[in-house]
Amino acid sequence: MGRYSREPDVASKTCKARGSNLRVHFKNTRETAMAIKKMSLRRAQAFLKNVTDHKECVPFRRFNGGVGRCSQAKQWGTTQGRWPKKSAEFLLQMLRNAESNADYSGLDVDRLVIEHIQVNRAPCLRRRTYRAHGRINPYMSSPCHIEMWLTEAESGVDGAKQGKKKKKTDGVEKATTKRQKQ
């Protein structure tokens, strides 16, 4: 299966989904994909449904020229955001595909996390629009290829991360108490 840009580390605990030459804007889809990366499957599905309902926005970080500001982008630490409905619907359909692949493979669907998601440009499709004085201008579309894989999250990893955070906060508290004593 050489159609993916890279292969997962543990193939037995991974489910994949991909789409080629999808008629959805590349830039919007890239920003939406980066927003759901590292999310759990259920959270990503809820997020994409909220985007279509304008309850949560997609932060625009790279392709943000001319993008307006919205208050919903504050939760992402940025000011610019949009609600790309068609991109959200395409990614939601791909997540459903990956979920059915995971169910077929016997993976625990509730523990799936989006480990890898990548959006590439597909060849542009050319149409024409008619202008004044007999001129014709191109009317291009920017389709994209999307690939993703989801892996089962291990509960031990989450506990290890929380343990590290506690140690850091303990160190900060100790430092503040030493300063207060001096």
Curated annotation (Swiss-Prot):
Any one GO CC term of this protein is: cytosolic large ribosomal subunit
Ribonucleoprotein keyword on record: yes
* Gene3D superfamilies cross-referenced by the UniProt entry: Ribosomal protein L22/L17
Q: What terms describe the molecular function in GO for this protein?
A: structural constituent of ribosome
At the top level, the lineage of the source is Eukaryota
Q: GO terms for biological process?
A: cytoplasmic translation
- List keywords of the entry alphabetically: Ribonucleoprotein, Ribosomal protein
Pfam families referenced in this protein's UniProt entry, alphabetically = Ribosomal_L22
Q: Where is this region: Disordered?
A: 155-182
What's this protein's family per the entry?
A: Belongs to the universal ribosomal protein uL22 family.
Q: What is this protein called?
A: Large ribosomal subunit protein uL22
Which lineage do the record's taxonomy fields give for this organism?
Eukaryota, Metazoa, Ecdysozoa, Arthropoda, Hexapoda
